[in-house]
UniProtKB/Swiss-Prot annotation:
InterPro entries: PurM-like_C_dom, PurM-like_C_sf, PurM-like_N, PurM-like_N_sf, PurM_cligase. The keyword Cytoplasm applies. Its main location: cytoplasm. One of its GO terms (cellular component) is cytosol. Pathway: Purine metabolism; IMP biosynthesis via de novo pathway; 5-amino-1-(5-phospho-D-ribosyl)imidazole from N(2)-formyl-N(1)-(5-phospho-D-ribosyl)glycinamide: step 2/2. This is Phosphoribosylformylglycinamidine cyclo-ligase. It holds the Pfam family AIRS_C. The keyword Ligase applies. GO terms for molecular function: ATP binding; phosphoribosylamine-glycine ligase activity; phosphoribosylformylglycinamidine cyclo-ligase activity. GO terms for biological process: 'de novo' IMP biosynthetic process; adenine biosynthetic process. It is found in: Cytoplasm. Belongs to the AIR synthase family.
Length: 346
């Protein structure tokens, strides 16, 4: 039977076209350490020029979750790749690692070359922001597994750090200052609740502007996750950082303790930073308690850094020079977990 594979739902020619379209975007991410080109069986990266005493490779993998469903609804696919990169590289930079390279995995019901090109365009933009090379990936057309409009997206990154410079959090003490770096919005966590609250129960439109939002709801919800790699690496060159937390799923309550040693907690000063209007809209429409908000969302802070009190103001200034909005949002205390304003739990 001629074209048997195509009749089964797999279009090889469309796959070839997608690869051809993505090459120009991938090329913009290349570093001098990359060996070979796109299309090999494996991506190669030369580590011989890194003058580190005890080089340690740090890896991370993640996906975008149900934020993808917003991309499907809006038929907008050119920024969701930034989210995939951000979720991976932010996780390894908190350990002091410089991201070196990234690989992506796209699984779809139907290979549409223009859509796949847009996804990879976003991935490439994320890699440029993080300074890492997109050295490989997989695009799998899986009819019957996904509908023709659906796809899933995941990524994998590897970075490097000198062993003596790994940021572990183990030296954090009571009295260290916590600096928060502003998020761009919801980032890539909590979207199952976002859809239920705003779209299903609230019946809000993606095309309308609500409350204090400056953009239509769909654009607000699809804002890419902020990538903190370059400002954090610059910070690490100039100051000692005792711990870092990427505020993802689980919000403040789950993620800040991940960087803290036993016997140390965090006290957060509410009102010390701006909480973006999208979080207020979610809380109002969904009638969500404040504790639940801080246990799910980043609430306007995408990264938390623990430093000595005497360094805090200089670090806020340095981060500002790197284009970040940074605020002193609290400090570490004897205890455990996260409390707010004078030791009160929400």
């Amino acid at each position: 039977m001629a074209n048997a594979y195509k009749q089964a739902g797999v279009d090889i020619e469309a796959g070839y076209e997608a690869v051809s379209r993505m090459k120009k975007h991938v090329q913009t991410t290349m570093r001098k350490e990359v060996l070979g080109g796109l299309g090999g069986f494996g991506g190669m990266f030369d580590l011989s020029k890194f003058a580190l005493e005890e080089p340690v490779l740090v890896s991370g993998t993640d996906g975008v979750g149900t934020k993808l469903m917003l991309a499907f609804m809006a038929d907008k696919h050119d920024t969701i790749g930034i989210d995939a990169v951000a979720m991976c590289v932010n996780d390894i930079v908190v350990q002091g690692a410089e991201p070196l390279f990234f690989l992506d995995y796209i699984a779809c019901g139907k290979a549409e070359p223009s859509k796949i090109e847009n996804i990879v365009k976003g991935i490439s933009e994320g890699c440029r922001q993080a300074g890492c090379a997109l050295i490989g990936g997989e695009t799998a057309e899986m009819p019957g597994m996904y509908s023709t409009e659906e796809y899933d997206l995941a990524g994998f990154t590897v970075g490097i750090v000198d062993k003596k410079k790994i940021v572990t959090g183990e030296k954090i003490e009571a009295g260290h200052v916590l600096i928060g770096l502003a998020s761009s919005g919801i980032h890539s966590n909590g979207y199952s609740l976002v859809r239920k609250v705003l779209l299903e129960d609230g019946e809000l439109s993606l095309d309308r502007i609500y409350g204090r939002l400056e953009l239509p709801l769909g654009e607000e919800l699809l804002k890419p996750t902020k990538i903190y790699v370059k400002p954090i690496l610059e910070l690490l060159k100039n100051h000692e950082v005792y711990g870092m937390a990427h505020i993802t799923g689980g919000g403040f309550i789950e993620n800040i303790p991940r960087m803290l040693p036993e016997g140390i907690g965090a006290e957060i000063e509410l009102g010390s930073w701006e909480i973006q209007p999208i979080f207020s809209l979610l809380q109002e429409v969904g009638k969500l308690e404040e504790k639940e908000m801080f246990n799910i969302f980043n609430m306007g802070i995408g990264m938390v850094v623990a430093v000595k009190e005497e360094d805090a103001k200089d670090i806020v200034r340095l981060l500002g020079e790197q284009g970040e909005t940074a605020r002193i949002i609290g400090r570490t205390v004897q205890g455990a977990g996260v409390t707010f304003n004078g030791g009160k739990a929400l």
